[in-house]
Amino acid sequence: MSERLILGENAIYTMNGEINDNILVIGGSGSGKTMSLAEPYLLETYASSIVVTAVKRRIIEQYAPLLRSRGYDVLDLDLAHPDRSDVTYDPLAYVESTADIAHLASAIIDSDPRKAYSSADPYWDKAATDLLKALIKAVLIRRSIGISAGATFADVLWLFDELSFDDKGGGRISTSLDGFFEQLAWSDTDGCAKRWFSSFSNLPIRTAGCVYSQLATLLSEAFTQELRNMMQNSSRALDLTQLANQKTALFITISPIVSAHRVFANLLYSQLFKALFELNGSRPLPVPVKILCDDMAAGGGIHGLPRILSVIREKGISVMALLQSEGQLNECYGHSAQSIFDNCDSLVYLGGMDVRTAQHISQRLNTGLEDVLWMPVGREYIFRRGQRPVKTVRYNIQSNSLYQQLLRNYKVSQEVYGCDTLRDN
């Protein structure tokens, strides 16, 4: 069955048409983004793999049975309770080359939610990235020569935990890992580990302290002990390429209040996009992949997302991103936010209290600002490239017979199995 795109009442479109299938959904809290757009997106998933970030367990519990009935392998990555996940994720599992190392380190630094508000010298980011690259490279070298055969990203974090430094005079530093990297040089054939580490160890003491403090805060918050434990469990390791080769639904559950989960999820997304792009040459993926990302700009940026959105169509990848306001995206991605808007051929506005967003919507509509700000709850504007804007009522999913059946089944399961039907059933 072909997949449809339900954007509103009597606003149903076909996927894979003349325009791209990237969709931005903007609406304030409680505007109906999940029920009127995200859940219909799931209902209409028949042939594509899908990755869903959600803050409510209800989403996976309600839709997993439906997707399994359609032949999907449903994977549950619960970052709020990693020990309960049926798959695990280790960022180091997708690192082989120097380019992979650079990508992972940059993705971690870019995922810092404080970057939007920071006035720190951009050089600090480069120095922190080089330090992280050095630690990743060191762990990979040790793994390749058999010292740490089962090394994971948790080993990279452990190595950082071991790092300390003192003033050796003249404003320069000596570190607790100087000897470690000297010994490693025998196996560091391209010299990258030593060179990257030297960019940190040669810093003045005050600058080194700032770089170290910035990176320590990010790593301690983004990689909780529970997530470190999960990364060390390789028996249920997630294979990101599976999404491109068979119908798969990956649900990523995050806490609505723990920013570390969003940072970790954004890191996964950055590696997912890279892994999918490297498959099948320049040809489309065997199985199209849809990404449904709730509150996409709420926890730091996804590394390279503006550029990624401009080219993912050729691979058969599409994104539905849910936001509360345009300002949220601007804070996260800065000037690159405009590129994200430009590469989403569908925009749905459900209303909200953000005046700047309303101003931009009124400009798109060529109408007065008050018409947008005073739009009744339950109404929405739909913008599609090459078409006139549509003002309509948001989709009432509760009138959908399939949704009604899913809801009945979910309620029965709740009564029989308790609070988490997937784990108790």
Labelled PLM ranges:
Residues 329-339:
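Short, glycine/polar-rich helix-capping loops at beta-to-alpha or helix-loop-helix junctions
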